[in-house]
Design a protein with these regions (language model features):
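A metal-dependent hydrolase metal-coordination microenvironment
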Residues: 52-198, 203, 210-227, 247-253, ...
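N-terminal membrane-anchoring alpha-helices
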Residues: 17-20
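Bacterial signal peptide processing site
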Residues: 12-15
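C-terminal functional module detector
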Residues: 40, 45-56, 71, 78, ...
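N-terminal low-complexity, Pro/Thr/Ser-rich intrinsically disordered segments
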Residues: 25-64
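Alpha-helix boundary recognition
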Residues: 86, 174, 236-237, 283
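Functionally critical loop-and-helix segments that line ligand-binding/catalytic clefts
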Residues: 227-236, 274
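Sec-dependent signal peptide recognition
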Residues: 1-7
Length: 365
């Protein structure tokens, strides 16, 4: 957690080894945003829920992957999108239209962060994915300061290597003045590996979607492909600093059974109710990801990782501590804690009896 601040310049970083393997890819996006945004460079932490003082850190619920009409694959207006999240008591969202930055629009209670989903759908990527040869390089630039007009052209079309393609996206994030980089649905059509994710993190990405509710099968993996949790642990064991996000990748806001409906995955950030503070807390890993579980504590304290489910939350819960890629403890109940190891990391996964989950970020000494 302490090391995360060193990477707050989310869009820049060092060189890393190249991953190997091959994958193919056609073209078809699925990530974007809307038309309302608040300028928000990086820096800072926490926010409130009711009416807490402006300087008080509170838990803030938000989505870092949202689409609107400007994305090309959603029919909802920006106003409609903002209204949907406001009505459900979200505190913030990031507008991430495909290869487009929507100019900021203010005057809403919902904090709207400017962003873009850099989208490239080539074929035949390396490492390989499945036999379809489809490949999806989708990267969110969050909290951008630049406002390019029209479509952003950024893709490296002269390589088949995923790492080089991701590097092109990271470079574009720098050009856009992004505060954070998020890797979206990395297992879509497979191809992501722990060493590749670690290399991408080393080059500047701080967030990765562990759970994208539109891609459940890809998140969970199968007999031939690792889950995103497994890939995340692999990257963490290689020393990477990268935080796990849950998102709805929303495109549909009217029909809950439509294609890519809103809701179902989000992050809850400990920060002040301020755009820069929210971005700073995301960069520092001061948040948990959720598909329905509500936590009141998810933080290190006195050398331990402490996890507590809200006292009024219904259902039964299992809290699992994963230490250096292996299940270290399993507690049935609403609260648990585990000592932070001298070497490596520990993270937690909370599962409710209905299948809803919360991912607590890894901590190190």
């Amino acid at each position: 957690m302490k090391r995360a601040l060193l990477l707050l310049a989310a869009c820049g970083a060092a060189e890393a080894p190249r991953a190997a393997g091959p994958v193919s890819v056609p073209s078809t996006p699925a990530d974007a945003a809307i038309d309302t945004v608040i300028d928000a460079p990086p820096i800072d932490a926490p926010a409130p829920v009711a009416a807490a003082p402006a300087d008080q850190e509170v838990w803030l619920k938000g989505s870092t992957h949202v689409h609107a009409r400007a994305s090309g694959d959603s029919t909802e207006s920006v106003e409609g999108v903002i209204g949907w999240y406001e009505a459900r008591h979200y505190d913030f969202i990031a507008l991430t239209d495909h290869n487009h930055v929507t100019p900021p629009e203010q005057g809403h209670s919902l904090i709207v962060l400017a962003g873009s989903e850099l989208t490239f759908n080539p074929s035949g990527c390396l490492p390989e994915g499945d036999k379809s040869k489809k490949c999806r390089i989708h990267v969110n630039a969050l909290g951008v300061t630049e406002r390019p007009v029209g479509k952003i052209e950024w893709a490296n079309r002269h390589t088949h290597w995923r790492l080089d393609m991701y590097q092109a996206a990271i470079d574009e994030c720098r050009h856009l003045g992004a505060a954070l980089i998020q890797i979206n649905h990395p297992q879509w059509y497979w191809g992501m590996t722990g060493d590749l994710l670690a290399a991408i993190a080393h080059r500047g990405a701080l967030l990765v979607e562990i759970s994208n509710i539109q891609f459940t099968t890809w998140n969970q993996g199968d007999a031939d492909h690792p889950s995103m949790d497994t890939i995340w642990d692999d990257a963490l064991m290689r020393g990477a600093t990268i935080w796990g996000v849950a998102s709805d990748d929303a495109h549909e806001y009217v029909d809950p059974h439509g294609k890519w409906p809103a809701g179902g995955g989000w992050v809850v950030v400990k920060a002040r109710r301020d755009p820069r503070a929210i971005l700073s807390s995301l960069a520092a890993g001061r948040f948990y990801a959720s598909t329905g579980v509500v936590l009141t504590r998810a933080e290190p304290e006195s050398g331990e990782l402490v996890v507590e489910v809200g006292p009024d939350e219904r259902g039964s819960y299992v809290i699992e501590f994963v230490e250096n890629g292996k299940l270290a403890d399993r507690v049935v109940g609403k609260s648990a804690r585990r000592a932070i190891p001298q070497n490596g990391y520990v993270r937690a996964l909370v599962t409710r009896d209905d299948g809803a989950k919360a991912w607590v970020q890894p901590v190190r000494r």
